[in-house]
């Protein structure tokens, strides 16, 4: 019983009295466990009734004080926790959240974390053994060092938690880059290929014409460069090329002295629309022209790889179009033609108007001239047949001259009789009394042109 009494005394000393609860600020605020009543019951067997009543009163007062202190400690328990005390918990929570967004966590991991973070009945948080493991400490240290030292790494780590995603487009290439795009055929094709720089050799694919298929000439290659060695075999080579594809694009290369003959042959094939000649024949030994051609073809192939239409890929559309009108002449010539036609039409209209307006004009003359008065001489009735034949030409000339003169006189008299008016002349107060009607008409005609 001595042992029980000692335990009872220790428990009683741990209970604060009302005076001690007010003045004892440095004492520990203990919590009564449920088994304290059992110890009191064991101790009650040796005591009397008065002692039991006193002990019961002490227990009641002590229990109320403990409950009040417990409520006060629980309400202010979050204020007693410093930021440094739970910083590792927040870091662990962030690492766990990031890990959950990246991977898949099992149910056991979640239960362990919940058990580790659950507070006990005493108001304290008990950390499990898993938080003290080296792996958890390593993750916390790495996260803190990344947040303090490098912001870029922090952004990189937090990227998996974002909801945005990048979708790469699907790319498809119909033709591999760097693949030969020009076909090189002919007997000295290999020799020509070896003489060009290596940067241009990748553009050509050297093959025999018999090994080339229709798909190669029509679809795979942009053009066919034909190297002619013997001009006598050129028609056979061109005919074989025309059989592979309809109207292929040909880049001719010939030997020295064959350019004119080959140009005439290609012109005949072009007229029949069997082939399309990309350029005039290039002499194989002319390095300047050859280099210019290769450089131009290299640029066209690069543009074709990048997706742009080139001169080699675009088919000729001039055959389907209507023939264009011929270009008009120079602007100055066109203006001169317009001005000349305008003046001519204006003068003609002015003359007609002036003649119609002067229909009432009459010349004051004593008497009209007879038709026979203006005839200078009589035309001989006949020509003697006995004259020599060399006199016929002068007589025929005199006959035509006299006829034209009489016709002019008759027309002049006819116009004098029809257009007899001088109304517009009287407006200006002019008096044209004259015995010579021809002189009067000569003065009137310039005035008519001025009136225009």
Curated annotation (Swiss-Prot):
It is found in: Mitochondrion outer membrane; Vacuole membrane; Preautophagosomal structure membrane. GO terms for cellular component: mitochondrial outer membrane; phagophore assembly site membrane; vacuolar membrane. It comes from the Eukaryota. The gene is ATG32. It comes from Eremothecium gossypii (strain ATCC 10895 / CBS 109.51 / FGSC 9923 / NRRL Y-1056) (Yeast). Mitophagy-specific receptor that recruits the autophagic machinery to mitochondria and regulates selective degradation of mitochondria. Mitophagy contributes to regulate mitochondrial quantity and quality by eliminating the mitochondria to a basal level to fulfill cellular energy requirements and preventing excess ROS production. Recruits ATG11 to the surface of mitochondria. Also promotes autophagy-dependent peroxisome degradation. The chain crosses the membrane at residues 336-356. The keyword Coiled coil does not apply. Residues 1-28 are annotated as: Disordered. The keyword Cell inner membrane does not apply. Its main location: mitochondrion. Belongs to the ATG32 family. One of its GO terms (biological process) is autophagy. It is a single-pass membrane protein. Keywords: Autophagy, Membrane, Mitochondrion, Mitochondrion outer membrane, Transmembrane, Transmembrane helix, Vacuole. This is Autophagy-related protein 32.
